[in-house]
């Protein structure tokens, strides 16, 4: 269901107009951010998500809805409703762990995603990194950051190994173990890109876990494991800069100390690796 109203509504207006029998439920943090909430009617729950990034165009939020609309139930929650500034999606009952699932299980889930039809829009990291630079706190801009950004832009993004629909925010809190298996939530960064970029961006604990995931995925996809790992490593500098820039971006938006701590730690990692 999609509304044609062009003026963003408040949460209370959304509830009274489109979900009159629903009320806000107990807040939950998994996969929710920026004013999103769970609403409930008796035992039925729905996730109401708000477009919370003031620097992102409305088209990006609509892409999020469209991605969910075309994905199968074996991968993601169903998209239920859209109006400018808001969407409602299925609430997935299950268990959310901060740790990633077993490498074989996660590889199978990602391979299943990458076998789906493409979304129709490409993920382009270079303009995204430039946006993070321009939108961050000016006091946080450093010569080191600018040098790394210019070097990546000069080199250009790696040539894709295989193009596929990507989730691009795979970590434990965005994976729900339902009665029917693993599902991914929080698809706001989804788009088409290199499968190795997806694997490079997974929030792993260390290189050992990363290699286990890469090897398991190579077995699923019948790709040479060494070739896949080389491609993942080509994307690694881009992903680290992406994470650092995103932390800076969120720090400027929210002022939350967790983001500045994460940004500082990511910059330390980059400097240690030269």
UniProtKB/Swiss-Prot annotation:
Top-level lineage group: Bacteria
Q: Where is the signal peptide?
A: none
Recorded GO MF terms: ATP binding; thiamine kinase activity
Matches recorded under Pfam families:
APH
- What's its EC? 2.7.1.89
- Pathway(s) where this gene product acts: Cofactor biosynthesis; thiamine diphosphate biosynthesis; thiamine phosphate from thiamine: step 1/1
Swiss-Prot/TrEMBL GO biological process terms: thiamine diphosphate biosynthetic process; thiamine metabolic process
Reaction(s) catalysed by this chain's protein: thiamine + ATP = thiamine phosphate + ADP + H(+)
Keywords annotated in UniProt: ATP-binding, Kinase, Nucleotide-binding, Transferase
Gene3D superfamilies reported in the protein's UniProt record? 3.90.1200.10
Role summary: Catalyzes the ATP-dependent phosphorylation of thiamine to thiamine phosphate. Is involved in thiamine salvage.
Q: Name the protein family.
A: Belongs to the thiamine kinase family.
Q: What is this protein called?
A: Thiamine kinase
The organism named in the record is Salmonella paratyphi C (strain RKS4594)
